[in-house]
Amino acid sequence: MARQIKRAANKKKKTAPTGVAHIQSTFNNTIVTITTVTGETVSWASSGAIGFKGAKKGTPFAAQIAAEKASKEAMSQGMKKAEVLVNGPGAGRETAVRALQAAGLEITLIRDITPVPHNGCRPPKKRRV
């Protein structure tokens, strides 16, 4: 007979009512991480973790689904308000912010923290299709 493995049920922690939503949007993927003000991760989701593969991970729709999933999980743990920090040049930036708002999180601040070089590294060569 196969022995049953005993698993501890995931404990739902009650978090602070305010937090920070970090949206990292690259050309290939979008990662949404919701943390407390002190920086402890409450929930996260990414386009790839949801099940999108290849070029579909970089789409605005994939970013929307990822943001909805992360915000629902954070709200189930007691979060109500969030600041939004957006990072990166990807297509899913605005869509992810709208999805957080539509899911019911009250957004208090939107800040773009994309690093801009003072003429640093040479950019990749232009694509010839």
Swiss-Prot record:
Name the Pfam families on file.
Answer: Ribosomal_S11
Locations listed in the record = Plastid, Chloroplast
Q: Does the keyword Chloroplast apply?
A: yes
InterPro entries of this UniProt entry?
Answer: Ribosomal_uS11, Ribosomal_uS11_bac-type, Ribosomal_uS11_CS, Ribosomal_uS11_sf
Task: Read off the PROSITE patterns from this record.
Answer: RIBOSOMAL_S11 (PS00054)
- Tell me, what is an example of a GO biological process annotation in this record? translation
Primary location:
plastid
| A cellular component term, taken from the record's GO annotations | ribonucleoprotein complex
What GO terms are given for molecular function?
A: rRNA binding; structural constituent of ribosome
Q: Which UniProt keywords apply?
A: Chloroplast, Plastid, Ribonucleoprotein, Ribosomal protein, RNA-binding, rRNA-binding
Record's subunit section: Part of the 30S ribosomal subunit.
- Belongs to which family? Belongs to the universal ribosomal protein uS11 family.
Q: Which NCBIfam families match?
A: PRK05309.1, uS11_bact
> What's the protein called, per UniProt?
Small ribosomal subunit protein uS11c
- Specify the species: Rhodomonas salina
